[in-house]
């Protein structure tokens, strides 16, 4: 059972790494004016909920399988994703809003957040890989 948890977590982490890279590429395209703000935000907003669900499922799965350290490591990022989604002001297009993305350095903060998430998911990838190998050896 433990190996199944880490195999699923590893696959989910791969998807989240892909999403983080996609966010970085799309935001850098906006920064370089290759795409406009509206198309950038619509592309990114449709992936916010899948990212939220994917990360939350892994976090809950780790809680249910009693892997406390990895759960506590994932909890702040999952909480941040939920908070960010819930706190979208009414009238905005989503987490990424084309009218506000160039204001107050939001583009830079979104880019920094995507980079931090990429680093976090890469760290988690290797932790899940190590834990999966350890679980398979112990079975």
Swiss-Prot record:
<keyword id="KW-0256">Endoplasmic reticulum</keyword>
<dbReference type="GO" id="GO:0005793">
    <property type="term" value="C:endoplasmic reticulum-Golgi intermediate compartment"/>
</dbReference>
<comment type="subunit">
    <text>Interacts with Sec23/24 complex components SEC24B and SEC24D. Interacts with CCR5. Interacts with ADRB2 in the early secretory pathway.</text>
</comment>
<dbReference type="InterPro" id="IPR003377">
    <property type="entry name" value="Cornichon"/>
</dbReference>
<feature type="transmembrane region" description="Helical">
    <location>
        <begin position="57"/>
        <end position="77"/>
    </location>
</feature>
<dbReference type="GO" id="GO:0005783">
    <property type="term" value="C:endoplasmic reticulum"/>
</dbReference>
<dbReference type="GO" id="GO:0015031">
    <property type="term" value="P:protein transport"/>
</dbReference>
<keyword id="KW-0472">Membrane</keyword>
<keyword id="KW-0653">Protein transport</keyword>
<comment type="function">
    <text>Involved in G protein-coupled receptors (GPCRs) trafficking from the endoplasmic reticulum to the cell surface; it promotes the exit of GPCRs from the early secretory pathway, likely through interaction with the COPII machinery.</text>
</comment>
<dbReference type="GO" id="GO:0005789">
    <property type="term" value="C:endoplasmic reticulum membrane"/>
</dbReference>
<keyword id="KW-0931">ER-Golgi transport</keyword>
<dbReference type="GO" id="GO:0005102">
    <property type="term" value="F:signaling receptor binding"/>
</dbReference>
<dbReference type="GO" id="GO:0031730">
    <property type="term" value="F:CCR5 chemokine receptor binding"/>
</dbReference>
<feature type="transmembrane region" description="Helical">
    <location>
        <begin position="118"/>
        <end position="138"/>
    </location>
</feature>
<keyword id="KW-0812">Transmembrane</keyword>
<dbReference type="GO" id="GO:0030134">
    <property type="term" value="C:COPII-coated ER to Golgi transport vesicle"/>
</dbReference>
<dbReference type="Pfam" id="PF03311">
    <property type="entry name" value="Cornichon"/>
</dbReference>
<comment type="similarity">
    <text>Belongs to the cornichon family.</text>
</comment>
<keyword id="KW-1133">Transmembrane helix</keyword>
<keyword id="KW-0813">Transport</keyword>
<dbReference type="GO" id="GO:0006888">
    <property type="term" value="P:endoplasmic reticulum to Golgi vesicle-mediated transport"/>
</dbReference>
<feature type="transmembrane region" description="Helical">
    <location>
        <begin position="5"/>
        <end position="25"/>
    </location>
</feature>
<protein>
    <recommendedName>
        <fullName>Protein cornichon homolog 4</fullName>
    </recommendedName>
</protein>
